[in-house]
């Protein structure tokens, strides 16, 4: 039996975390002993882990890092590692150099600095694994590279690497100690190799696995929108973070309110540190009823099913699981023309792309409202679309053992994967 370890930063309601759950389900096999270590020891999605996955955290908090309680818990973890274990002193040079570099760029990201402290302060795992996988960039990758014993090590990259704020100075050459790197899209691979061109031969694409049947089943369960609104419903799903550019979406909604021939209401499912700032902007523009921050929903799929249009207005992406979920449910999609999004949407075939500014978003939404037949065709083509390739999955299995093991395990899962 092969021992497989996954490490992830948190297990909150995020695209990478949900993609990990789908991967863990696809890996169910009597030939594998699967373990998971959550670096921060917190997150709401741990309750959805398959029963055959062994969670290694001695202490665990079922709260999101995006809530006040979760942020205090995370701060406590950082302080225990930084102060209790002396890492703030030992890593003072590293922290100051990177803080200065961030300040020079006008973009200070404390979370990127904390990942190194958390990774080095977390307990080292004593067991040796056949394959250890860092399923997210940052802390999980630092931990697997330096604190885990394994015959082989792999790391996943889910974002546009440099745009997200990562780079060589932060990473301390951690990828030199990784045997294989998987990126979730071709564009993410290209951007990662702009930072690390020397690792091209050990970097390949592994698309997020999407359980289409599960999404369609859950879309029929529970309730979605409960208000009595009878106009056009726009939906966006994602954390309230700067990357998602909700400020632009709010301004686009203000324009829609003035010029749309039909009532429009925009709903957002997600939580994050920007909530207060966004609520203030919504109040300032008088959009309290028109642009609604609804928080996290355990089952978001009835909302997808009930919306008229899915809009994904972001500054950059890796490969958006939210877009894939909207495609699985046959929704017309408007996304901003940026890395990640443009690889998922074929212009005027299964959706539309536009620049990231309020005027363009408003103009495209009005066009889609005015062309329902075209939008129905976009949704139908999106539903028929193959959402991912299994090539990356087969490559992943190959890291566990030789060709024979890869072929045996691939046969066990191929039917399930291709039916999604």
Tell where the protein language model's regions lie, with residue ranges.
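Conserved acidic donor-binding segment of nucleotide-sugar-dependent glycosyltransferases
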Residues: 347-359, 367-372
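Nucleotide-activated donor-binding/catalytic signature segment of Leloir-type glycosyltransferases, i.e.
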Residues: 52-55, 279-295
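Acidic anion/phosphate-binding donor-loop and adjacent secondary structure
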Residues: 162-167, 193, 202-231
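A conserved mid-protein helix/loop that constitutes part of the nucleotide-sugar donor-binding site
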Residues: 17-22, 232-255, 273-279
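A short, well-ordered alpha-helix in the C-terminal region of glycosyltransferases
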Residues: 283, 360, 367, 374-388, ...
């Amino acid at each position: 039996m092969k021992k497989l370890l996954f490490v992830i930063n948190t297990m909150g309601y995020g695209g990478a975390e949900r993609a990990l759950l789908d991967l863990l389900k696809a890996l169910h096999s009597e030939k594998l002993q699967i373990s998971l270590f959550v670096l921060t020891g917190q997150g709401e999605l741990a309750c959805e882990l398959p029963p055959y996955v062994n969670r290694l955290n001695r202490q665990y908090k079922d709260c999101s890092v995006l809530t006040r309680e979760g942020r205090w818990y995370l701060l406590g973890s950082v302080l225990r590692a930084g102060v209790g274990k002396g890492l703030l002193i030992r890593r003072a040079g590293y922290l100051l150099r990177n803080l200065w570099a961030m300040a020079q760029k006008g973009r200070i990201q404390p979370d990127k600095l904390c990942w190194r402290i958390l990774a080095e302060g977390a307990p080292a795992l004593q067991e040796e694994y056949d394959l250890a996988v860092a399923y997210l960039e940052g802390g999980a990758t630092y931990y697997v590279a330096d604190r885990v014993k394994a015959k082989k090590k792999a790391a996943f990259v889910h974002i546009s690497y440099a745009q997200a704020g990562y780079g060589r100075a932060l990473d301390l050459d951690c990828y030199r100690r990784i045997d294989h790197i998987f990126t979730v899209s071709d564009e993410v691979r290209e951007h990662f190799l702009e930072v690390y061109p020397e690792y091209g031969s050990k970097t390949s694409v592994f698309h997020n696995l999407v359980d289409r049947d599960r999404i369609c089943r859950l879309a029929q369960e529970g309730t979605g929108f409960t208000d009595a609104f009878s106009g056009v419903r726009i939906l966006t799903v994602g954390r309230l973070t700067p990357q998602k550019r909700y400020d632009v979406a709010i301004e686009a909604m203000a324009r829609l309110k003035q010029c749309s021939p039909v009532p429009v209401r925009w709903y957002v499912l997600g939580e994050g540190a920007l909530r207060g700032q966004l609520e203030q902007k919504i109040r300032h523009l008088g959009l309290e009823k028109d642009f609604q921050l609804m928080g996290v929903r355990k089952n978001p799929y009835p909302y997808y099913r009930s919306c008229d249009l899915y809009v994904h207005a972001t500054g950059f992406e890796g490969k958006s699981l939210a877009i894939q979920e909207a495609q699985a449910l046959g929704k017309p999609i408007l996304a901003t023309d940026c890395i990640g999004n443009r690889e998922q949407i074929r212009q005027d075939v299964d959706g539309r792309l536009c620049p990231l500014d309020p005027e363009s978003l408003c103009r495209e939404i009005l066009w889609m409202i005015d062309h329902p037949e075209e939008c129905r065709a976009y949704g139908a083509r999106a539903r028929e679309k193959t959402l991912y390739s299994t090539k990356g999955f087969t490559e992943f299995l190959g890291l566990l053992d030789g060709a024979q093991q890869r072929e045996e395990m691939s046969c066990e899962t191929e039917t399930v994967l291709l039916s999604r």
